[in-house]
């Protein structure tokens, strides 16, 4: 059970960092 909690926290942190960088700089590659 503890492993699932740590994995969930890790994924959550990575998504927060990803969205922070994604919205801070306007993506040029993602424009389709």
From Swiss-Prot:
Record's keyword annotation contains Thylakoid: yes
Origin superkingdom: Eukaryota
Q: What InterPro entries does the annotation carry? A: PSII_PsbT (IPR001743), PSII_PsbT_sf (IPR037268)
Q: How does it sit in the membrane?
A: Single-pass membrane protein
On whether Protein transport is a keyword of this UniProt record, the answer is no
One GO cellular component term: chloroplast thylakoid membrane
One Pfam family hit = PsbT
Q: Which UniProt keywords apply?
A: Chloroplast, Membrane, Photosynthesis, Photosystem II, Plastid, Thylakoid, Transmembrane, Transmembrane helix
- Disulfide topology: none
Q: What GO biological process terms are annotated to this protein in UniProt?
A: photosynthesis
Transmembrane region(s) = 3-23
- Provide the protein's localization: Plastid, Chloroplast thylakoid membrane
Query: What job does the chain carry out?
Result: Found at the monomer-monomer interface of the photosystem II (PS II) dimer, plays a role in assembly and dimerization of PSII. PSII is a light-driven water plastoquinone oxidoreductase, using light energy to abstract electrons from H(2)O, generating a proton gradient subsequently used for ATP formation.
- Subunit structure, interactors included: PSII is composed of 1 copy each of membrane proteins PsbA, PsbB, PsbC, PsbD, PsbE, PsbF, PsbH, PsbI, PsbJ, PsbK, PsbL, PsbM, PsbT, PsbY, PsbZ, Psb30/Ycf12, at least 3 peripheral proteins of the oxygen-evolving complex and a large number of cofactors. It forms dimeric complexes.
Indicate the family of this protein: Belongs to the PsbT family.
- Give the HAMAP family listed for this entry: PSII_PsbT (MF_00808)
Q: What is this protein called?
A: Photosystem II reaction center protein T
- Per the UniProt entry, what species is this protein from, by scientific name? Cyanidioschyzon merolae (strain NIES-3377 / 10D)
Tell me the name of the encoding gene.
psbT
